[in-house]
């Protein structure tokens, strides 16, 4: 479908929540995207509504195919393979234990459950970092806000204000728009949840 036809269709059936650049991507390989007119672009986007894995990477496609043949998705109310391993890997990386993370990643990739389980157990003197898995930046940001307020409440210090940087963007939910501190994004949705204060980055 041409860009013009796609624009016409979306003008009728897709909510106009933000402006779009007049380009329709129809294919991607590696970091190259191809528009409907055949023009190629380099994909440098990361962090806003994107999946930063490249396009058509054989290793990613193979992993996706293998996983979807086994199990597509289940609720997080159940245990699933590799969630604990990935969380252990992230904890090691947060501790700057690159070598330990590499050994753990290799064991996970090789399917060596015994080694991966042993390596994943924290050492007695190891700082353990817990992971909250989220499916979007807004959900991750709201999760961090909830954790900060829960920590302050449990610490008994009465702190419940989140400090936000002016000019930042934290998501499209009501709470993350309140944290975004940009009037042009907030005006249409007032009143907003409270508990945020803005500061200007230096």
Please annotate each region the language model reported.
Residues 23, 154, 187-189:
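Short secondary-structure boundary/capping segments
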């Amino acid at each position: 479908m041409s860009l013009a036809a796609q624009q016409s269709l979306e003008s009728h059936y897709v909510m106009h929540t933000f402006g779009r650049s007049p380009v329709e991507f129809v294919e991607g390989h590696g970091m190259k995207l191809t528009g409907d007119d055949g023009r190629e672009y380099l994909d440098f986007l990361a962090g806003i509504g994107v999946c930063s894995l490249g396009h058509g990477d054989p290793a990613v496609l193979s992993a996706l195919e293998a996983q979807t043949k086994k199990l597509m998705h289940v609720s997080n109310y159940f245990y699933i393979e590799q969630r604990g391993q990935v969380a252990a890997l992230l904890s090691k990386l947060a501790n700057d234990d690159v070598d330990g993370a590499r050994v753990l990643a290799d064991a996970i990739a090789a399917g060596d459950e015994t080694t991966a389980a042993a390596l994943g157990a924290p050492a007695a003197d190891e700082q353990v970092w817990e992971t909250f898995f989220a499916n979007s930046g807004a959900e991750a940001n709201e999760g961090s806000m909830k954790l900060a307020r829960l920590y302050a409440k449990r610490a008994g210090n009465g702190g419940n204000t989140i400090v936000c940087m002016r000019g930042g963007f934290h998501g499209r939910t009501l709470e993350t728009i309140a944290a975004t501190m940009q009037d042009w994004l907030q005006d249409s949705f007032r009143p907003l949840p409270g508990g945020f204060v803005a500061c200007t980055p230096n």
